[in-house]
Amino acid sequence: MDGRAEMEVVRTTKGNAAGEVSVHVVTTESTVQSTHLPTTAFIFPSQANATTINLPTSTLEIQRFPREPPRNTGAERPEKGVGSEPITATVIPQISGVQTCNTVRVLEWKDGVATLPGSNLRFRINEYGTLKVVSADKMPPAEAVKEGHAKKDGDSDVAPTSRDNTIVAQDVPEQSKLPTADSICHCDTCGRRHVSDGAREGRGFCSEHCHQQFKERSVIVENSASSTSATEILKPVKKRKRKDYQSPSEEDYESEQMEEKQEEMKNSVGDSAISNPEAHAWSQHSTEGPGASEEKKEGWSWASYLEEQKAVAAPLDLFQDYQVASQHKNGFKVGMKLEGIDPQHPSMYFILTVAEVCGYRMRLHFDGYSECHDFWLNADSPDIHPAGWFEETGHKLQPPKGYKEEEFSWTNYLKITKAQAAPKHLFVIRNTHEAPPGFEVGMKLEAVDRMNPSLICVATVTDVVDDRFLVHFDNWDDTYDYWCDPSSPYIHPVGWCQEHGKPLTPPQDYPDPDNFIWEKYLKETGASAVPAWAFKVRPPHGFLVNMKLEAVDRRTPSFIRVASVEDVEDHRIKIHFDGWSHVYDFWIDADHPDIHPIGWCSKTGHPLQPPLRPKEPASSAHSGCPTLGCKNIPHTKSSKYSFHHRKCPTPGCDGSGHVTGRFTAHYCLSGCPLAEKNQGKLKADLSDTEASTRKRNLIGFPQRKKSRHHGSFRGRPPKYRKIQQEDFQTISSDNMHQSLFMSALSAHPDRSLSLCWEQHCKLLPGVAGITATTVAKWTIDEVFSFVQTLTGCEDQAKLFKDEMIDGEAFLLLTQADIVKIMSVKLGPALKIYNAILMFKNADDTLK
C-alpha cells in the first residue's frame, strides 16, 4: 500500500514525570489503494528495546489525538461513528536496511506472527507484503503460515524488512473497546469495512469477489516465498503486462539471452557467406574454428584427413609470412572505401568499396562499375591503399564512372556517397618504403610473359611502389603487366636471352624483329637497362608432390579448398583439389598469396571446402551446373568465371593462348592452340613472313597480336568475357542472364568480343545462323522484320523503318546510338545491340 507518512516524536511532560515521550504516526494514504479514512496509531516498544529507537528509558504513554474530520472520498460505504468503527493498524516494514528499521525491530516474531512487547497487539503479513494488526480470534493456524513469512529461530530480534522506512498505521483503540471480529471486519482485499455474517467462508472479506482475488494473489506469494529470501517476500507483487518470471533474476537472465540471440542473428546475417571452418591447429591437433561449418557438421578435420590419406601437410617454413595466418584481425567492414590496383589492368588505380568480408579475405567492388569486375584478396594485400594515397605518391587515380578526373575529391565523394574511408591503420605497413635499388621507372629489361610463359619479351619498368615495381611489355596492352620484386624468377637483365640461348620476343610492330639488337633499341628509345647487380636470385621452393595445403579456387574465388601438390617446378607448384577431376588442376607460384598452410582457414575464420566425397552427387538435378560437386553457388556476377565449370579439355593445356591470337586465354576446345583439329588452322594462318618468328618463339602458344588501346579513355576500360562453347542443355535462364547483358556494358566494345553463341541464341532465337555478311545485304524491310522478331522489341521496329536503316547501317549502330539518338528504351536496346554483336561474332568465327 503506497502512501506518504509523517512521523512525529512529541516530548511531553505529565505531572512531575519529565521526559515522557509520545510517538505518533500520521499517514495520508492514496485514494487509489484504499478509501478508508486516515487514522493515527501508536506503537509502544518494550523497556528493553526502548534504546533501539533512541528514546529515553522512561515510561512511554499513549496520547490520544482527535481524528481528522471525515472527508468525502466518494466511497459508497456508510459512514460510522468513531467509537464503533473497527480499527486496523498496518505497518509497512522496510525491505532494505534492516539494521536501520528501529521501529519494526521492536516486534517479536514467531511462526509468522509479530507481537508488540507489553501489549496484546499482534501482526502478520498480508497479501500486499505489509504488516496488519490481527485479533486473537483471527490468528491463522501455525501450519498455514509459510516458512518464508516466519523468522528464523534464534533471530527473534530481527524482523522482516519493509519497502520504506515508514509506518502506516491506523488509530488503535484500547483492546477492551475493540468490537468483536464476528461483527465488524476489515476486508483484506479492498480495505472496506463490513459486517461479517459469520456464515461465509471468507470472513475477512466483504464479498466473494474479494475473497477469490485474495486466493489468487496468495498463490503467487506462496509460490515465490519458497524460493526467495525474507526480504524478497516482503516485496509487493506487481501486476505485469508481460510474462511472470519464476525467480527475481529470471527476467534479467532472459533479457541477456535475448540480447545474445539477437547478436548471434546479426553475426549470422553479416557472415551469411561463412560456414564454420574445420577444426585444426598448426601442430595438427584439433582446434575448433569460429562459426558453424559444413565440414564441422560432417565431422571433417585436417588431423583425421591426413591420417586417413597417409599424407603430410606442407611445412610452415615453406610459406611466406603473408601466406601464414596473420596475427592481426581483418578490420575492414562492408561499405568502407579505399584505393586499389585493378588486377586486370595492374597499371591502373581505382576507387574500391568493400563488398564482402569473409575471414581474412574480402571482396572489392569498383565504384560505378558492374559487379562482374569484383575480385577477392587478402586484407594484407599490397595492392590496396588508404584513401588519398594516390595524391601523396603522385599516382593517377581513375575516378568512379560518371566523375571527371579533375573534379574528383575524396572529401566530396565521401559526403555524396555517405560512406566511410577505410582507416589507415587497417592497411599493412611495409617494412620499407624505399624503392628496390637499381630499378627506376623507364629502365629496360627482359621479362617472361606470365600469360604465355614460353615467351620472353622486351619490357620496361613503368612504376615503383615500396619494394615492388611494375613490368610492362613494350607496345603491348597493360593487361599483360605484372608487379614483382627484384628476386622474381620472371625477370632478367638485358642480354640474358642471348647468353642462355633463349629466343627474345621484340616489341610489337618492331620494324625488323629478326634483327633486334638491344644496343640499337636502347639508343632509339633513349632508355637505359636495369643493371645486372640489381637482380636477386630466388632459391627454389621446398614443396613436394602430395603435400597438403589450402588454396583458393580460381574458378570460384570465394572458395578455399583442400588441395594437394600435384607437380612441382623450381618456382611453381601445380595445385590439385582433392576429390575433384584433374581437369581443374592449375599452376601457381609458390609464393602466391592464394595458397596457405593447413589450418589457415580455421585461424582466420574463413570457411574451408572439404574434399569432394564419392557419395556426393555430381550435381543436383536442378542445379544447372554439370560440375562434379557443384552446389550451384553462383559467382558474384563475375564475367571471367560466370561459368565456373568450364576449362579447356585438351590434356596438358592450362588454358593459355587462343588459336585466333585475339585472346590471352581460352576455355574450350575450339580455341585451344594445342588441339589436333586446330593445328591445320593454326598453320594456315601463319604467313611466310611470320613463320620464322613463330617457329622460334611459339612453343604451344601463339604470338600475341596487338590489342593495345589507342588514345585516351576515361574510366575503366571494358572487360570482355572469354567463354568456350559447350553443351548448354542444363544451363538455366538465370545463369545466362548476366552473360547476355555484359556485352553491352561498353558503347564501343572490341570486335573480337567472344560471345556465348548457343547460350544467347536461346534468348535471341532470331540471330541463329545469321552472319554480319548476310545482314549487310538486308533491305530496310528486312531489318524491320528482324527487329520485330526480337521479344519485346515489336514497338521499336517501326523506328528503324522510319529512320530508313538498312542492313549495313544496322551493323554500324552502337548502344549509345540506339538509346540516345533513336530513343529506344534500355531493355529493347540491349537485345538489339547484342544481336548486332552476335552477327559480327558469327562472321568472325566463319573467317
Curated annotation (Swiss-Prot):
Pfam families reported in the protein's UniProt record: MBT (PF02820), SAM_1 (PF00536), zf-C2HC (PF01530)
MBT repeat feature ranges: 300-400, 408-507, 516-611
Presence of the UniProt keyword Repressor in the record: yes
Span of domain SAM: 778-842
Subcellular location: Nucleus
Gene Ontology cellular-component annotations: nucleus
Site (Mediates recognition of monomethylated and dimethylated peptides) residue list: D449
Membrane spanning residue stretches: none
Site (Positioned at the entrance of MBT 2 and is required for recognition of monomethylated and dimethylated peptides): N452
Alphabetically ordered keywords of this record: Chromatin regulator, Metal-binding, Nucleus, Repeat, Repressor, Transcription, Transcription regulation, Zinc, Zinc-finger
Chain positions covered by the region annotation Interaction with monomethylated and dimethylated peptides: 473-480
Record carries keyword Transport: no
Residues annotated to bind Zn(2+): C648, C653, H666, C672
BP GO annotations: negative regulation of DNA-templated transcription
InterPro entries recorded: Mbt, MBT_L3MBTL1_rpt1, MBT_L3MBTL1_rpt3, PcG_chromatin_remod_factors, SAM, SAM/pointed_sf, Znf_C2H2C, Znf_C2H2C_sf
CDD domains: MBT_L3MBTL1_rpt1, MBT_L3MBTL1_rpt2, MBT_L3MBTL1_rpt3, SAM_Scm-like-3MBT3_4
Zinc finger (CCHHC-type): 639-682
Molecular functions (GO terms): chromatin binding; histone binding; histone H4K20me2 reader activity; zinc ion binding
Region Disordered, annotated ranges: 65-87, 142-163, 237-296
Its job: Polycomb group (PcG) protein that specifically recognizes and binds mono- and dimethyllysine residues on target proteins, thereby acting as a 'reader' of a network of post-translational modifications. PcG proteins maintain the transcriptionally repressive state of genes: acts as a chromatin compaction factor by recognizing and binding mono- and dimethylated histone H1b/H1-4 at 'Lys-26' (H1bK26me1 and H1bK26me2) and histone H4 at 'Lys-20' (H4K20me1 and H4K20me2), leading to condense chromatin and repress transcription.
Domain free text: The MBT repeat 2 specifically recognizes and binds monomethylated and dimethylated proteins. In contrast, it does not bind trimethylated proteins. The MBT repeat 1 does not bind methylated peptides but inserts a proline ring in a Pro-Ser-Ser/Thr sequence context.
Assembly with partners or alone: Homodimer.
Record protein name field: Lethal(3)malignant brain tumor-like protein 1
